[in-house]
Structure formats: structure tokens, C-alpha cells
């Protein structure tokens, strides 16, 4: 019997109709919360994640307290089942130079408190000068399981470190065929072989079993960014438009960053809304001015100061771009047509 949790969504959510609101509440009442959970945040210009003024440090810590609880698995009424490790990374620049900016653990975040909060304290310290953070708590559905959480996947390319965390599942054979152009071009994947975590060559049967589908999604996106002359927006558009045509039923909730911006994409036929962003504003106007950060979470806090932030749902097939200058939504992103407003920018304001 799956564990379920009754949720009374205290964070304000924009709905297009009252019937849509009722439908989503009903789904939330009966849906088990047993998928991977994602978190990311970006500070606004002139601020780092350290800044405690205007409630910034407080709300981020509350987001991460909730996020840690989502990385656990207990008996009885515990609503989460993300016990296959946790990981976080933070940026102080567009490239990640120090190994201490990344942590990966094979343990459930909910029970790995010492390591979790040591890293959080470091990430939010003044010395770190951090401006972007990403996190993932894992319920393994593809590839190796008893390993430190491999999300977010990282690649340093052309002097910039890219990162991706994913919730969902996509057929690995479909992804391999996309990356290799149906087996005719192995140049990209040979240059960036997927990990097998100690189980041999990725093309061998054993090695392939341990490859994680999310890393192949990352490689496919990065190949398209390269092919689009390092234009992230166009690369994401090219990669996701093809992927949605080839594998429209796979769950593809993605957080992607280049160290300058955060790109959050939601794609799932599940009726549960499971990716939200906050623009830093509060429900209660007396708490404004707003926090000087934007965040993305699969399941935002419902209590405390972070629970009083405005949290907006990212709809099916929507891309939300969180930059230091604002947030831009792209509805039905895979069908987006590039226009003059998009230009050749690597990030979208």
C-alpha cells in the first residue's frame, strides 16, 4: 500500500480556473510523494547566498530544511521515499574550480544531517561568495543505485561548468540513438563517455545497465548547446523539442544551470504539479521588500517564512528561466519559435 500524505497547499498557486484548483487539490490528497526532489536558488545582483538581510539566508535555510526531509524513507506515515543519496553543488563563478563546492552522498539526506548541514553552512558562508546552488535527493529508477548521488551531473565546457539534475525516467536506448544519430556518429559520446560507476565500459552489457538515463539527457542537451555555438537557450530548445517528439511520455523534470542562470523545465503527464518557482515575494505584503533570491523546488515548504513566499507552478512543457534580472516563462517550450527577441543570447531575461 503506497504511503500518501494529505497536503493543504499554503503556498499561493496561480490557477486558471476554480475547477482546476479543485482538481489539483484532489490529486494532491491521494498522490504518494515518492519521486526524486529538486532544489535550486539564485541570488540577485549585488547579493550572494550569504546575505542575511531581507530574510535571504533565513528562507534559503528553511527551503533546505524541507528539502532534507524529502530525502528520506521511514515507515508508517512518512510521505517520501528518496533514500538513494543526496548531492548539492554551488557556484561562485560560471566555472566550479574547487572540489569543496560539490558534495555527493550515498546516504539519505534525512539521516545524513551532519554532512548535509556542514555543506549548507559552507555554501551560505560569506567566504564562499556563492550565487547559485543546486540540490537533488534521489529515488533511483535508472542505472546504478548504491552509489553517491550522481545528480547534479557536471561538465566543464569552454571554460564554463554546466550542471543538470533530473527527476523522471527516459528510455536510455532512445537517448543513445539521439546522441549518436542512430548509431552513425559516436564522436560526442566517445569524448564524454557516461559513467558506469566501476562496472566497466559503458557499451558492454554490464556497464550499460549501470548508466543513468539522466546523464544521457545531460549529454544530449550539451551536444545541442555545442551545435548551437554555445547558445544555451537555442541548445535547450533543439534538444527538448526532439526529445519530446521521440519520447513524449517520459517524465522529464529538469533543473539546468551554466553558473549564470537557472533553467527549470517540467514535462510529465502526471496530474500532480511537482515543480514550482518563487520570485522572492511574500504573500503578506507587510513582509516585503522581497527576498533577494529566486528558487525552484519540487515541493516547497508549507510552514515558516519560506512557506509564505509566493510559489508558482511550472506547467507541463513549460521552461522557466531564472536570471539575475528576472524570471521568464516559456509555455509549451518545445514548440517555441525563435524570434528577434530571443536573439543570440546565452541566457533569457
Question: What would you call each of these model-derived segments?
Answer:
Residues 88, 150-170, 240-301, 307-319:
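Conserved catalytic micro-motifs used in adenylation/nucleotidyl-transfer and phosphoryl/amide-
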Residues 66-76, 183-206, 286-288, 339-344:
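Surface-exposed intrinsically disordered loops and tails
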Residues 106-122, 137-159:
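Short acidic (Asp/Glu) patches
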Residues 171-258:
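Short histidine
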Residues 31-114, 269-272, 312-313, 317-345:
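Extreme N-terminus nucleophile/cap motif
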Residues 121, 132-135, 225:
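A basic- and aromatic-enriched beta-loop-alpha substructure that forms the phosphate/nucleotide-
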Residues 1-33:
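Secretory targeting signatures
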Amino acid at each position: 500500500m503506497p504511503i500518501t500524505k494529505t497536503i493543504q497547499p499554503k503556498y499561493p498557486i496561480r490557477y486558471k480556473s476554480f475547477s482546476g484548483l479543485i482538481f489539483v487539490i484532489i490529486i494532491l490528497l491521494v498522490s504518494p510523494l515518492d519521486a526524486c526532489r529538486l532544489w535550486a536558488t539564485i541570488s540577485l545582483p549585488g547579493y550572494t547566498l550569504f546575505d542575511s538581510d531581507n530574510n535571504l539566508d533565513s528562507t534559503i535555510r528553511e527551503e533546505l530544511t524541507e528539502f532534507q526531509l524529502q530525502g528520506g524513507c521511514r515507515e508508517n506515515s512518512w510521505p517520501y521515499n528518496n533514500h538513494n543519496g543526496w548531492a548539492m553543488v554551488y557556484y561562485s563563478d560560471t566555472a566550479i574550480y574547487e572540489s569543496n563546492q560539490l558534495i555527493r552522498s550515498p546516504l539519505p539526506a534525512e539521516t545524513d544531517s551532519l554532512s548535509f548541514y556542514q555543506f549548507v553552512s559552507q555554501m551560505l558562508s560569506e567566504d564562499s561568495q556563492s550565487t547559485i546552488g543546486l540540490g537533488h535527493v534521489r529515488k533511483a529508477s535508472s542505472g546504478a543505485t548504491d552509489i553517491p548521488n550522481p545528480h547534479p551531473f557536471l561538465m566543464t565546457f569552454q571554460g564554463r561548468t554546466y550542471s543538470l539534475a533530473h527527476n523522471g525516467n527516459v528510455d536510455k536506448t532512445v537517448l543513445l540513438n539521439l546522441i549518436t544519430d542512430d548509431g552513425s556518429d559516436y564522436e560526442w559520446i566517445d569524448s564524454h563517455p557516461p559513467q558506469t560507476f566501476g562496472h566497466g565500459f559503458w557499451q558492454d552489457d554490464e556497464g550499460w545497465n549501470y548508466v543513468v538515463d539522466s546523464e544521457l539527457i545531460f549529454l544530449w542537451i550539451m551536444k545541442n548547446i555545442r551545435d548551437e555555438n554555445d547558445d544555451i537557450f537555442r541548445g535547450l530548445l533543439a534538444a527538448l523539442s526532439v526529445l519530446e517528439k521521440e519520447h513524449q511520455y517520459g517524465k522529464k523534470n529538469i533543473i539546468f544551470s551554466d553558473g549564470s542562470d537557472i533553467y527549470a523545465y517540467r514535462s510529465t503527464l502526471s496530474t500532480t504539479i511537482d515543480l514550482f518557482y518563487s520570485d522572492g515575494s511574500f504573500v503578506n505584503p507587510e513582509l516585503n521588500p522581497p527576498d533577494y533570491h529566486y528558487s525552484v523546488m519540487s515541493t516547497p515548504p508549507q510552514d515558516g517564512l519560506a512557506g509564505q513566499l509566493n510559489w508558482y507552478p511550472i506547467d507541463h512543457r513549460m521552461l522557466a528561466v531564472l536570471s539575475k534580472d528576472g524570471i521568464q516563462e516559456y509555455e509549451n517550450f518545445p514548440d517555441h519559435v525563435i524570434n528577434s527577441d530571443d536573439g543570440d543570447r546565452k541566457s533569457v531575461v
